[in-house]
C-alpha cells in the first residue's frame, strides 16, 4: 500500500472529530462514482445500514472531503469506525486524493497494493486505485470503480478467475474488460451512457423535458437498426418519428437507447468478443438486462451479476487483504 498522504483537507472537513455512542467497531465501504456515492456500514461482516450522497461530478459547493464527512457523520457519531475504504472516483484527480492507476495486467494483489492511505485522527481512509490498460485498439484506456466489481465477481464466482473471460460493465462509461487467469488484461471504454444523457436532454433529438414510459418495441427497433446502419445515420430517426409518425417522447428515448446500446454491442461482437463462451454482465439489473437483450438479439450468450453485490465483495477483498499489509 502507498505511504500515508496529507490529511489536512480531511481534518478541516471534520474527520478529526468522532464522538462514539456505540462501542461496537465497524467498517465503512464506499463506491463513489461520478454520479453518486453509495456507502455501506459493516459490522461483524454484515451490512447494517446503507446511505447515498452526491457523486464526485455533482459537487459544486462542497469539497469531496466535506461531502463525505457530512454523509458519514451519523455513522461516525454512533459507531467506532476502524477504517473507511473507498473505490471509484474518490481516487481521481477531482476526488479525495489522487491515487495513481495500477497498470495492467493487474491481479487482485497488485491492484490492492496500489491503494492510497490517509490517516486523520482516529480515522484510516483507504482509497483504492483504478486500472490503466491498453484497449482493443492498442490505445491507452482507464477505469476507476469497475475493477472493484470485477475482483468482487471473482470472489463471488471463482470460476471467472480461470482462463480468458470478457466482462461487460454498463454505465455512464461502459467498460468491456478482458481478464486472463484472474488478471485484468485489457479494457475498452464506450461513451454510451453519457452520450445517451447528452442526446436525450441537450440535443434536438427529443423534445425539451420529454420523458414518458419506456417502449420495448422501440428499443428492439433500435437494436435492429444499429446492426444495419451507421449510428450517425440512425440518430435522427428519434426526431423524425416524433414529427412525422407522432411517436411519443418515451418511444423516442427507447429507440435512442436501443440505437446506442446496439451500436456498442454490435461493434464489439464484430471483433469476435463472446466467441470464448458467455460474456459476464455486471451492474444494475435493469441496465444489464437491456445489454442482455442486445447480446441475445445478435446471437451472443451472457450471464448477469448484480453490480452492488460485486462491488461489496470487491471492497471486502481489498480491505481484508490490506489488514495484513
Predicted feature residues:
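Glycine-rich phosphate-binding/hydrolytic loop that grips phosphoryl groups
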Residues: 303-325
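Short glycine-rich, Thr/Ser-proximal phosphate-binding strand/loop in the N-terminal lobe
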Residues: 27-63
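Glycine-rich phosphate-binding loops at beta-strand->alpha-helix junctions
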Residues: 36, 276-294
Amino acid at each position: 500500500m502507498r505511504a500515508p498522504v496529507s490529511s489536512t483537507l480531511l481534518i478541516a472537513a471534520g474527520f478529526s472529530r468522532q464522538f462514539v455512542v456505540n462501542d461496537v467497531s465497524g467498517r465503512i465501504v464506499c463506491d463513489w462514482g461520478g454520479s453518486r456515492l453509495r456507502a455501506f456500514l459493516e459490522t461483524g461482516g454484515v451490512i447494517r445500514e446503507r446511505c447515498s450522497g452526491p457523486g464526485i461530478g455533482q459537487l459544486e459547493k462542497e469539497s469531496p472531503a466535506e461531502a463525505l464527512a457530512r454523509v458519514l457523520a451519523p455513522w461516525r457519531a454512533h459507531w467506532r469506525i476502524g477504517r473507511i475504504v473507498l473505490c471509484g472516483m474518490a481516487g481521481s484527480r477531482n476526488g479525495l486524493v489522487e491515487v495513481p492507476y495500477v497498470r495492467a495486467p493487474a491481479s487482485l494483489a497488485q491492484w490492492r497494493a496500489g491503494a492510497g492511505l490517509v490517516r486523520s485522527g482516529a480515522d484510516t481512509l483507504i482509497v483504492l486505485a483504478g486500472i490503466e490498460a491498453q484497449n482493443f485498439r492498442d490505445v491507452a484506456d482507464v477505469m476507476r470503480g469497475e475493477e472493484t466489481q470485477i475482483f468482487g465477481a471473482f470472489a463471488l464466482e471463482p470460476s471467472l478467475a480461470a482462463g480468458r473471460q470478457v466482462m461487460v460493465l454498463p454505465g455512464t462509461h461502459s467498460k468491456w474488460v478482458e481478464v486472463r487467469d484472474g488478471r485484468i488484461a485489457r479494457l475498452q471504454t464506450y461513451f454510451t451512457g453519457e452520450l445517451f444523457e447528452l442526446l436525450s436532454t441537450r440535443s434536438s433529438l427529443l423534445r425539451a423535458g420529454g420523458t414518458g414510459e419506456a417502449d420495448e418495441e422501440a428499443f428492439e427497433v433500435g437494436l435492429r437498426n444499429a446492426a444495419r446502419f451507421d449510428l450517425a445515420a440512425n440518430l435522427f430517426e428519434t426526431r423524425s418519428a416524433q414529427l412525422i409518425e407522432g411517436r411519443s417522447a418515451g418511444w423516442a428515448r427507447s429507440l435512442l437507447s436501443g440505437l446506442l446500446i446496439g451500436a456498442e454491442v454490435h461493434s464489439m461482437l464484430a471483433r469476435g468478443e463472446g466467441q470464448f463462451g458467455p460474456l459476464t454482465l455486471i451492474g444494475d439489473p435493469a441496465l444489464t438486462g437491456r445489454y442482455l437483450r442486445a447480446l441475445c438479439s445478435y446471437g451472443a450468450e451472457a450471464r448477469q451479476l448484480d453490480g452492488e453485490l460485486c462491488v461489496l465483495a470487491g471492497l471486502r477483498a481489498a480491505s481484508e487483504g490490506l489488514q495484513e499489509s
